[in-house]
């Protein structure tokens, strides 16, 4: 398991996860989807994958996990865990994940 980054944002875990999914879909290089079997009542787990398309073929490479925990008062704590892939393009994929994390941080209101 890789580096962990934690911060708190406004909104419930469900609202924030939907916003992250939509943002990732619009960005195009990564997907971020809720993984129901790794989630529970208070915490949602999201898989972040790189997407590479070649004609009809689509390759997904796991880059990391986002855990969204209800912090009360319509706030959510995000824990973002990098999981560097065992892949020939590891450095490039790590850079894609790091860029996505920075964009998520800057896009969502980070609370102290």
Where are the model-predicted features located?
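Amphipathic, interaction-prone secondary-structure segments
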Residues: 39-59
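Glycine-rich, flexible loop segments associated with nucleotide phosphate handling
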Residues: 34, 38, 60-63
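Hydrophobic transmembrane signal anchors and adjacent membrane-proximal interface regions, especially
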Residues: 30-33, 46-48, 58, 110
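Beta-strand/loop substructures that line and gate deep hydrophobic ligand-binding cavities in soluble
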Residues: 53-112
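Short beta-strand micro-motifs in enzyme catalytic cores
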Residues: 3-5, 42-44, 76
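Terminal, regulation- and interaction-focused segments at domain boundaries
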Residues: 1-36
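A short, structured loop/turn motif at beta-sheet edges
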Residues: 10-13, 37-40, 68-76
């Amino acid at each position: 398991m890789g580096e962990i980054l934690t911060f708190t944002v406004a909104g419930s875990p469900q609202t924030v996860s939907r916003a992250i999914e939509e943002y990732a879909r619009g960005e195009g290089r990564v997907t971020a989807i809720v993984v129901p079997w790794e989630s529970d009542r208070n915490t949602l787990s999201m898989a972040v994958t790189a997407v590479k398309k070649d004609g009809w073929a689509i390759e997904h490479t796991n880059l990391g996990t986002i855990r969204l925990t209800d912090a009360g008062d319509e706030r959510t704590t995000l824990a973002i865990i990098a999981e560097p892939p065992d892949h020939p393009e590891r450095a490039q994929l790590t850079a894609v994940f790091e860029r996505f994390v920075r964009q998520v941080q800057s896009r969502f209101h980070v609370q102290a």
